Amino acid sequence: MSSVEVSLLGSLANIGALLATPLCTYLLNSLGRKYTCMLFGLPYVFCWIIITYTKSVTVVIAAMGLAGMGAAGQAASSVYISEIAQDAIRGALTSSVVSGLFLGLLLSYSWGGYLSYEQVVYVHLTLSILYILLVGLLKESPVFLMKSGKEKEAARSLAFYRRVSVTSKEVEVALAKIKLQLDPALETRLEGGKDPGVTDALVEGKAEEKRAVSEWQFLKNSQSSKRGLKVAIIVMAYTVLMGVIVMQVYAEPLFKEAVPSMESNQCSIILAIVFIIASLLCGVLVDKLGRKYLMIGTTFAAGVCILLLGTQLQFHWAPNYVSAIFIYGFCFFYNLGPAPIPFVIAAEFFLPEVRGLCSNLVNACAWIMNFITLTIFSIMVEVFGLAPLFYIFAASSAFGVVYCLFYLPETKGLSVDAIQLLFIKERRRDAK
């Protein structure tokens, strides 16, 4: 493959994901969370079927673009999980999306070293089909069911995920909280300083009647949603600009220089193991330490690692194996916080009326930034080398630490109405 074809193979998936994002937004609110997740598994099935029957580089690249359309469904997965999870464990469960991604990477790297090309393709095709079948066994999100006026089905969904009786008090309280989230007067009440707790009227189902408003119109009128979207997009943008994509692309030549005695496939497997350990640890810590300070600490640590790696590449002040330590250190801290937390906050910041839209806008930002990073920065590497590029990534990390310190709210264990109140209070402080 030529250098252009290799570049397209890596970046075209981001374009496919970006193009499919509007469709994901529409389907989340029309088809539902569960069936959207199933539908976005189909591009992977078609991708592997195409690759099974062709050896053409052009067709394989096109198939990867098709698989990228399936990647747009990551927003649907995050929204789905956040809506079926209880507030106390929402962060851990939502971050499991990233843990699953890295587990898949580890398995793919492992199979790549021991299976033939055809066997790898068939395994991935089988898993893609299995994913669709297994998701089909789950219940729809209770929030979406309530939005659709299916209260009895929502109660059954809650009972299924909480493992309790449909008539239990826990289900009754959970339904009341969902009604509160869907109350069109919620933000007005919060703006007026009223207690966002569940009122007797809401428990009795006497919330104001919903008016038909488009997602874009709701977002335009919702100050808390606009502020949450701004914060989520900035956090997502700076985490991509921390350079993990470039690190993954150039990991092999860096490892060859740092540890020439180790095969590149072994280095990739170890890297995937580091990814998984960090993301699983994030699942434990994100609901204990909280999003804000875990994000600040890990961003700072990852920035230090990437800065030291840049100086090592430029000045060679330590043995070559130190580069490998910095690479693993950066990847560990990045996947402990900056990798999963943006997807967690994108799934929990927003009211149900705009959750699908805003989550997809945040994900679209990620696809755009990934594409820019892979295309523009690859040119910059040829002109300036890797070391100055890593200084840019370190600067992005420094920006992220400062931004999260002042603007990222702590949402650990908070309900969606309490999160809206945080953004409203922040806006009031800015207005003073």
What residues fall within each predicted segment?
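Short, well-structured alpha-helical segments
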Residues: 168-183
